[in-house]
Amino acid sequence: MNESENSPQHNEVTVPMVEDTSSNADIPMEQIQREDNKNYDKHDNECFDMNGNHNNNSDNLQFDSVPSSATKDLKNIKSVTNQNVKIEESSSTNSVIEESSEPKISKLENVNLAATVGGSQTRKYLNTNVTPHLLAGMRLIAVQQPEDPLRVLGEYLIEQSNILKSGEKESNASK
């Protein structure tokens, strides 16, 4: 950012305002802007005490008092800053996912989940026959991030099923 963007400009409307323009239909825009600037000037000369109470006596101005126009600008700056932080975090996450597109062998692939976890017969069946393929397919769609992730996951699972069937046929033929 430039320094001119960071420093507040006096007598300029820096905060976009939404207002009812139906009553201002016949008034030129320049006059409306001049009136807005006058309102900001008046407001900047008013004082607030430590509790936020309003008084017009500038002799009672305290060090920590802040005009509300400055507070509005500060809130807008904070919201823009928070949005930028969120964008940066998500963009760095995406770059990490793209860089890790090479398949990595997990230590858990060689673990017999059914024996390790135990549980009901249904849980053992799912852990043996479904979960490893489902997790591998979910890793695939997390890396690729396709437009239709469910279709890609389904096609991957069908492909794995065909590979398992052909592997069983080959093992039966060799016996």
UniProtKB/Swiss-Prot annotation:
One of its GO terms (biological process) is subtelomeric heterochromatin formation. Residues 32-45 have a biased composition (Basic and acidic residues). GO terms for cellular component: chromosome, telomeric region; nucleus; Set1C/COMPASS complex. It holds the Pfam family Dpy-30. The keyword Nucleus applies. It comes from the Eukaryota. Residues 1-45 are annotated as: Disordered. It is found in: Nucleus. Residues 1-12 have a biased composition (Polar residues). Keywords: Nucleus. Residues 121-162 are annotated as: DPY-30. The keyword NAD does not apply. Present with 937 molecules/cell in log phase SD medium. Belongs to the dpy-30 family. Component of the Set1C/COMPASS complex which consists of SET1(2), BRE2(2), SPP1(2), SDC1(1), SHG1(1), SWD1(1), SWD2(1), and SWD3(1). Interacts directly with BRE2. Component of the Set1C/COMPASS complex that specifically mono-, di- and trimethylates histone H3 to form H3K4me1/2/3, which subsequently plays a role in telomere length maintenance and transcription elongation regulation. COMPASS recognizes ubiquitinated H2B on one face of the nucleosome which stimulates the methylation of H3 on the opposing face. This is COMPASS component SDC1.
